[in-house]
UniProtKB/Swiss-Prot annotation:
Gene: ycf65
Any one GO molecular function term: structural constituent of ribosome
One GO cellular component term: chloroplast
Key words, A-Z: Chloroplast, Plastid, Ribonucleoprotein, Ribosomal protein
Subunit structure: Part of the 30S ribosomal subunit.
Source taxon at top rank: Eukaryota
Subcellular location(s) of the protein: Plastid, Chloroplast
Name of the molecule in the record: Small ribosomal subunit protein cS23
Organism: Mesostigma viride (Green alga)
Lineage of source species: Eukaryota, Viridiplantae, Streptophyta, Mesostigmatophyceae, Mesostigmatales
Length: 123
C-alpha cells in the first residue's frame, strides 16, 4: 500500500508496511488536528473525524471514538493514543512550533500536512 502526500508541488511516496492504522495530523500554527485511518490492501480508509487540539481535547475525543470501534483492540487504541500524546507534546513543547518536516522526521509512521487539501491517497 502506498500513500502519496502532495507538498509544495512535489509528491513524496511513503510505505507503511504491516500497520493496521495510521495517524494523520493537520499541523497548523495555532491548532493541531488528528484523525485515524485504517490501512488496507486497497489504500487507506478514514475511521474517525479530525479532532482539534487545543481548541478541544483532541486526545479525549480520540479515546472516545476509538472506544466506540469494537474491532480496534485495546492495545491498538493504547498505541494510537500514546503516539498522539507524543505528537501533541512535541507540537506544544516550545513557543516556536517545530516545522512540518521536523515533525515528519521525528514521527515517520504518521502522516503530516499543513494544508487539509494537500493530503491525497493513491493505491
Amino acid at each position: 500500500m502506498n500513500i502519496f502526500i502532495k507538498q509544495n508541488s512535489s509528491t513524496v511516496k511513503r510505505r507503511y508496511p504491516l500497520q493496521k492504522f495510521v495517524l494523520k495530523f493537520l499541523w497548523l500554527e495555532k491548532n493541531l488536528a488528528v484523525t485515524v485511518d485504517q490501512v488496507t490492501n486497497r489504500g487507506n480508509s478514514p475511521i474517525t473525524e479530525y479532532f482539534f487540539w487545543p481548541r478541544k481535547d483532541a486526545w479525549e475525543e480520540l479515546k472516545d471514538a476509538l472506544a466506540n470501534k469494537p474491532w480496534i483492540s485495546y492495545d491498538e487504541s493504547i498505541a494510537l493514543l500514546n503516539q498522539t500524546t507524543d505528537v501533541i507534546n512535541y507540537w506544544q513543547e516550545d513557543e516556536k512550533k517545530p516545522s512540518l518536516s521536523e515533525a515528519q522526521a521525528k514521527f515517520p509512521n504518521c502522516i503530516f500536512t499543513d494544508k487539509f487539501a494537500n493530503c491525497l491517497y493513491e493505491n
